Swiss-Prot record:
<dbReference type="InterPro" id="IPR004515">
    <property type="entry name" value="Phosphoheptose_Isoase"/>
</dbReference>
<dbReference type="GO" id="GO:0097367">
    <property type="term" value="F:carbohydrate derivative binding"/>
</dbReference>
<feature type="binding site">
    <location>
        <position position="169"/>
    </location>
    <ligand>
        <name>Zn(2+)</name>
    </ligand>
</feature>
<keyword id="KW-0119">Carbohydrate metabolism</keyword>
<dbReference type="Pfam" id="PF13580">
    <property type="entry name" value="SIS_2"/>
</dbReference>
<dbReference type="InterPro" id="IPR046348">
    <property type="entry name" value="SIS_dom_sf"/>
</dbReference>
<comment type="function">
    <text>Catalyzes the isomerization of sedoheptulose 7-phosphate in D-glycero-D-manno-heptose 7-phosphate.</text>
</comment>
<feature type="binding site">
    <location>
        <position position="62"/>
    </location>
    <ligand>
        <name>Zn(2+)</name>
    </ligand>
</feature>
<feature type="binding site">
    <location>
        <position position="177"/>
    </location>
    <ligand>
        <name>Zn(2+)</name>
    </ligand>
</feature>
<keyword id="KW-0862">Zinc</keyword>
<feature type="binding site">
    <location>
        <begin position="91"/>
        <end position="92"/>
    </location>
    <ligand>
        <name>substrate</name>
    </ligand>
</feature>
<dbReference type="InterPro" id="IPR050099">
    <property type="entry name" value="SIS_GmhA/DiaA_subfam"/>
</dbReference>
<dbReference type="GO" id="GO:0005975">
    <property type="term" value="P:carbohydrate metabolic process"/>
</dbReference>
<comment type="similarity">
    <text>Belongs to the SIS family. GmhA subfamily.</text>
</comment>
<feature type="domain" description="SIS">
    <location>
        <begin position="34"/>
        <end position="189"/>
    </location>
</feature>
<feature type="binding site">
    <location>
        <begin position="49"/>
        <end position="51"/>
    </location>
    <ligand>
        <name>substrate</name>
    </ligand>
</feature>
<feature type="binding site">
    <location>
        <position position="169"/>
    </location>
    <ligand>
        <name>substrate</name>
    </ligand>
</feature>
């Protein structure tokens, strides 16, 4: 059992080292885009499925509530949290529309719309990001593997260089925490 634990921790460390080596400029760009948008009175919309839905909710909570700094709340919405909206849209239009319909209702030009997908190929995230692009939003993909179909439609892809879903999710939450820290410092220091 100890060997398996050490193997998992080594794997985590290797992915985090690759994130540092390969994604630092993209993470900085992501944070810069979000700071500029929030300074301009825009908001963050964020979505994903399964574990990525939980990460989307976590991201929005850190932006609306606080990350480390006592400060005013900032506008962010996780499109994954309202069960009435999700089930109504899913029932009436199908699961592929659950995020797209919310982007249609909530996204304004200049908002930052983030899709999380460990595969990079979630259809409902793709459709929502495509609409966000049409509406003049800034689109970011927190992705995994090779970035899938999403990397080609977002303004900025931040693709964790791993094919292992747990490691990708760990990369995503680390990136989210770094971005939250940079947003607070960029807006309030």
């Amino acid at each position: 059992m100890n060997e398996e634990i050490m193997t998992q921790l080594r794997s985590h460390r290797e992915v985090m080292e690759a994130v540092e080596r390969e994604l630092t400029p993209r993470i900085a760009a992501f944070a810069g885009m979000l700071v500029a948008a929030l300074k301009g009175g825009k908001k963050l919309l964020v979505m994903g499925n399964g574990g990525s839905a939980a990460d989307a909710q976590h991201f929005a909570a850190e932006i609306v509530g606080r990350f480390k700094m006592e400060r005013r709340g900032l506008p962010a919405v996780a499109l994954t949290t309202d069960t009435s909206i999700l089930t109504a849209i899913g029932n009436d239009y199908g699961f592929d529309a659950v995020f797209r319909r919310q982007v249609e209702a909530l996204a304004d030009e200049g908002d930052v719309v983030v899709g999380l997908s460990t595969s990079g190929s979630s259809r409902n995230v793709y459709d929502a990001l495509a609409l966000a692009n049409d509406r003049g939003c800034i689109t970011v993909g927190l992705l995994g593997r090779d970035g899938g179909t999403l990397k080609d439609i977002v303004d900025l892809d931040v693709t964790v260089p791993s094919g292992d879903t747990p490691r990708i999710q760990e990369g995503h939450i680390t990136i989210i925490h770094i971005v939250c820290d940079l947003v607070e410092k960029g807006l309030f220091k």
